Amino acid sequence: MASMLLARHLACSFQHSYRLLVPAAAPPVNCSHCQCFHTPVPKKSDCYNAMSRHFLEKRKEDALMKQLNIIQNAEAVHFFCNYEESRGNYLVDVDGNRMLDLYSQISSVPIGYSHPALLKLIQQPQNASMFVNRPALGILPPENFVEKLRESLLSVAPKGMSQLITMACGSCSNENAFKTIFMWYRSKERGQRGFSQEELETCMINQAPGCPDYSILSFMGAFHGRTMGCLATTHSKAIHKIDIPSFDWPIAPFPRLKYPLEEFVKENQQEEARCLEEVEDLIVKYRKKKKTVAGIIVEPIQSEGGDNHASDDFFRKLRDIARKHGCAFLVDEVQTGGGCTGKFWAHEHWGLDDPADVMTFSKKMMTGGFFHKEEFRPNAPYRIFNTWLGDPSKNLLLAEVINIIKREDLLNNAAHAGKVLLTGLLDLQARYPQFISRVRGRGTFCSFDTPDDSIRNKLILIARNKGVVLGGCGDKSIRFRPTLVFRDHHAHLFLNIFSDILADFK
């Protein structure tokens, strides 16, 4: 089983299949009644003939792929893009093919490609220095740094978390969140005294007590990044972890819910109870092993691992367990954050009485970082640090993105468009149960299972040939990660195309 899984990933068959396109043409879609953005855009971009396919005889993509592969392994590359011509929900490749993008750079495009408001922002003379000069924010921040943080990230700070540290990506956000948790936990144990001489000396040779043997509890199927600490908590695909040394940290089972939910209420409650019991057992077990669990990390929806959901009650009880055992509760909102579930942060759906202790973000937030409670504040400079600590130009862009989200009510749009998408997927499941099962989602953060990875990959390939970009996750799931400007008519457009694909699928 393990060798088969590894062989599949080493072969990268899924990535390769993206490039084996065959000429196909979907009829152009006249979208003159619906602009690429809610905000007016230049006339040439108003109507995007979204699904037209122009398979040119001399394909630029093949040449570019060969060039890139000379200098690095390019097997993961799906295709090369023309971002100058991409607008709104439509991505254009280097050969001129326009596609409805329902994957949006692995869920990292908040308000569509080349949004006119963002283009206008970067053209304003007073903003030029912010894009040209990238400061070492930890020691030499710009004069307006605090102001821009208040206008951007702090304006959407999750409940109970007043402290903020910016980073560049999701992995470094989680990695430094782990460090923050370990320092907080050791400070609790140390009390008021400072560092001992023994601690200062032993930490330099990676030994206790200077380097205590703490752990972070994670869940099977999780994905939290590819750096060393994050990789120890990532359990989605073997190819991510093979050959890399790691830590002996506890891994709990994540609920595997049965669908439709309303037909398996009792079974799903029992499944969640089983997983929660295992969490507590592992915390006790690792305490006895002298590998104390300092924190628990969890995704609101396991994304890379297969879009695995759990009930709001599961997360409330998980938070209670963390508090009971003195563990920090870390919520990874790298992929779920930014509004795609219908709330700005997916964990807001849970209704926690006691907020999470730490929450990481990236992707749609255009920068990385983490919010945390006051008690997790580092007690000395340089303990959480790197050269750039993010990028102030991204805070400038994010402030405008948040303004647009609020002005155009894009959170409610995500909820409504997501309902249209989910309803349509349920209808397709009823009509084609041999291809679609376990339809699930929150907002536009939707997915379904296919019979196996071969069928999944083939469906994604055919969809791209018909002008739609989809993403895979887990062993056999297809996931949807559209932008926040994904509207009802985009959902209907996709559903019509995918219905035809399923009708002809063999």
Where are the predicted features?
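Adenosyl-5′-phosphate
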Residues: 21
